[in-house]
């Protein structure tokens, strides 16, 4: 599911935008590339300390979009590339993935699990 170029972007710091929508209103929260942990073939785990509006929206509508990128990775023609991810999400408060992430990021209160259905390079 995830290309070598995508994995290269994750190795470079950059901002990740997480877009949710409920009640006809979009909400955007942010995190960092370095916080994304890939598990299984199409799942990404993200530590969550706040993300209250994100969680409320996901409880109503689990569809999410994420964008991320790095100016340090070669794109189609020039330096800098980005990706658009689409999928569904849920928050984990227990289980093996939660424990693994809590050990790695002690500040988290929950883990955002994104099941990616599409990963498209945009630059």
Region spans (language model):
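Binding-site signature for planar aromatic cofactors or substrates
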Residues: 1-123
């Amino acid at each position: 599911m995830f290309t070598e170029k995508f994995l290269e972007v994750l190795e470079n710091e950059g901002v990740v935008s997480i877009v949710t929508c409920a009640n006809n209103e979009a909400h955007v929260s942010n995190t960092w590339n370095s916080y994304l942990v890939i598990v299984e073939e199409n799942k990404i785990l993200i530590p969550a300390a706040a993300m209250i509006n994100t969680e409320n929206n996901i409880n109503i509508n689990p569809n999410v979009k994420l964008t991320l990128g790095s100016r340090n990775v070669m794109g189609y023609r020039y330096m800098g590339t980005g990706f658009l991810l689409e999928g569904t999400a849920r928050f984990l408060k227990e289980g093996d993935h939660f424990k693994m992430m809590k050990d790695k990021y002690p500040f988290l209160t929950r883990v955002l699990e994104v099941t990616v259905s599409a990963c498209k390079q945009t630059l």
